[in-house]
Structure formats: C-alpha cells, structure tokens
Design a protein with these regions (language model features):
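N-terminal beta1-alpha1-beta2 module of alpha/beta enzyme domains
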Residues: 1-71, 175-177
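Hydrophobic faces of well-ordered beta-strands that scaffold small-molecule active sites
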Residues: 11-17, 40-42, 69-73, 101-105, ...
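Conserved, mostly hydrophobic/aromatic
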Residues: 36, 60, 93, 142, ...
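Glycine-rich, proline-tolerant flexible connector loops at the mouths of alpha/beta enzymes
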Residues: 39-63, 75-77, 203-209, 299-313
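Alpha-helix-loop-beta-strand connector modules within alpha/beta enzyme cores
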Residues: 51-74, 134-141, 222, 313-321
C-alpha cells in the first residue's frame, strides 16, 4: 500500500479474535498466516465469550510458523493473577513459539463499562486512578523480570511485591518480548513512553490520531530529555479499529444491519463512524489517511472474525495498492 505522497508504506495488519469455537479459531489463525497477516491476537476474560487465552495461543504456536501471537489485552490486576506467573507464562510462550509472542496490556476500560465482566467472579474492578497505578507498577515488574540482567528481582510497590524472584532465561526467551500499551490519557501515555515498544490508541479518526500522536511524541521526547536517555529511537504506533468490508453495496448494507442488531443502534453508529467500513477501495483510502497520520500497525476487529472471505478480500485489497 502507498501513501498519498507515493511513498511505500509497510503497515502491518493484525487480527483481533474472540469466540469459543476452537476449530474456527485454529482455522482462522492458519488462514491469517497464509494470507500474510502480521499477527493473531485472542481475547482474554473470565466471561464465557472466549476460552482461556494463554492456553489457546500456546496451542496456536505449535501449528503456525511465522505469525505473531498474543492476547488482545491481558490484565495486570493483582486479584486476577499473580504477575510473576504471568511473566513466566509469557516467557514460556516466547520459548515454545520461537520468539513470536507480542504482549499487550493497558489500564482497561471504564469502571462503568468493565465491572460487569469482573464482579461475577469475585473481583472488584478498580477505579481509573488505581488501574493506572497498577499498570505502572505491573509493567515495571514485567520489564525487570524479562529484561534485567540479574539473577534475582525484588520490587516493593503498593500493588505488587516481588522478593528475590528469578526466571529461567534461554537463548530464545532472552529476545525482548515486544510490549504494546494501549493509552489515551496523559499518565498512561507517559507509561507507554517509558516501557512500550508499541503505543496503541483505539477507535478514533485519522484527524484525532494525528493530534494524539503528536501529543505522544511530545511526551516521549520529554521523557528522554528528563532522563537523559534515548530509550527508543522509534516507538511503533498502532490503532485498533472495527472492520466491515464487502465487495458489493448490497452485501455491505446487510453486514451493517447485522452489526447494528448485534451491538445496538447507538453503539453501532459510533463504531461505524470511526471504523473501516466500505468496499475495498474505500477502506484502502481510509487506511492511507491513517498511515499519513502516523499509524504503523492496524489492529483489526472484523465484524465476524471467522469470515474467511472478508479476511481474504481485505488482504487482496492491500496487495493491489
């Protein structure tokens, strides 16, 4: 795909997948690798909308060769899972996948939106300020466990405590695990500037991304200046978007109606306004707008993640541009 100024663009395209039908998940991952998608990321929650994420992606690593794997988002909540266990799970997957894990996290959605996913399982979903502090401590602990060249790690925080913890490192799992942090707020963008390899925003227009991207770059430069370092010459930029693609007007309108029934009219309207919706040429033009705004990676939630025709149609459109 080329940007409007004619320069080549090497954007990567990733799939966001949820669901409980393992055969569909497996077959879609195999197809995604064949079609040239960069990554395949599976949902994580305790609810019945999906299976266990880390079990699934470990299995997928054994039946694929190149495609990157990881969670759509994995949670650092102390009530949910011991962070040392999570670090060990990640390093193990990095080993068995031959270095293909990409780890994704963030502070999480609002209390009003997300509490319903946690309360049935005895977990009190923290407020925004608490979640931001948990994220900051959690990624610091993970960074120490994965990357610090010491035999033991100790950390004393408000939410996480580690004393003399060690993780076995091998040639493969010593390779840095790429860390994506989803962030829109000042504080979470500061955390991303300090620790992330990939910074991600979600469901915004190219114009909004341009503004937020500039803000993130300023935060990153300020972090480097304040600390006298150049932590990363370039942090990749990612955006999460919904996708509805069809090769005819009638099919497109049908998919939009189904989407509205599934999500509800008001939610669907907001998503459609910010998503990649249209025929291949229309979606390609929208992608060019995002790449011109600074997007390196597209994290794509197709209306039906198991729609093989749509997945193929999308990648064919990218190949012809």
């Amino acid at each position: 795909m080329k940007s409007s100024n004619g320069s080549n663009n090497n954007s990567s395209f990733c799939l966001e997948v949820w669901g409980t039908d393992y055969n569909k998940i497996k077959n879609t991952c195999i197809l995604a690798e064949k079609l040239g998608y960069y990554g395949f990321y599976y949902g994580e929650s305790l609810a019945d909308i999906d299976l266990d994420c880390w079990t699934i992606i470990s299995n997928l690593s054994a039946i694929t060769n190149k495609i990157k794997l990881g969670p759509v988002i994995t949670y650092l909540l102390p009530q949910y899972r011991n962070t040392f266990l999570l670090a060990k799970q990640a390093m193990t997957l990095q080993e068995v996948s031959n270095g293909r894990l990409e780890f994704r996290t963030g502070a999480g959605a609002t209390l009003q939106w997300s509490s319903q996913w946690w309360h049935p399982y005895g977990i009190d979903y923290p407020n925004n300020a608490q979640r931001v502090s948990i994220l900051e401590e959690g990624v610091q602990v993970l960074d120490m466990l994965w990357n610090k060249q010491t035999t033991a790690v100790s950390f004393e925080g408000k939410y996480f405590k580690v004393k003399g913890a060690t993780l076995q490192k091998t040639t493969i799992n010593q390779k840095r695990i790429p860390l994506t942090i989803a962030a829109k707020q000042n504080k979470t963008m500061q955390i991303a500037a300090k620790y992330a390899d990939i910074w991600e925003s979600s469901y915004i227009t190219p114009e909004q991304f341009t503004s937020l991207n500039k803000k993130f770059d300023d935060i990153h430069k300020q972090f480097n200046s304040d600390n006298g370092v150049n932590r990363s010459k370039k942090i990749s930029k990612s955006i999460e978007l919904d996708v509805i693609i069809a090769d005819s007007d009638s099919d497109l309108e049908y998919k939009k109606r189904v989407f509205a029934m599934e999500r509800g009219p008001s939610v669907a309207h907001q998503i459609l306004k910010h998503g990649l919706v249209g025929k291949p040429d229309e979606i390609t033009e929208k992608l060019i707008e995002y790449t011109n705004a600074g997007v390196d990676q597209f994290f794509l939630a197709f209306q039906d993640p198991f729609d093989s025709k749509a997945l193929d149609l999308f990648m064919k459109a990218m190949a012809t541009r």
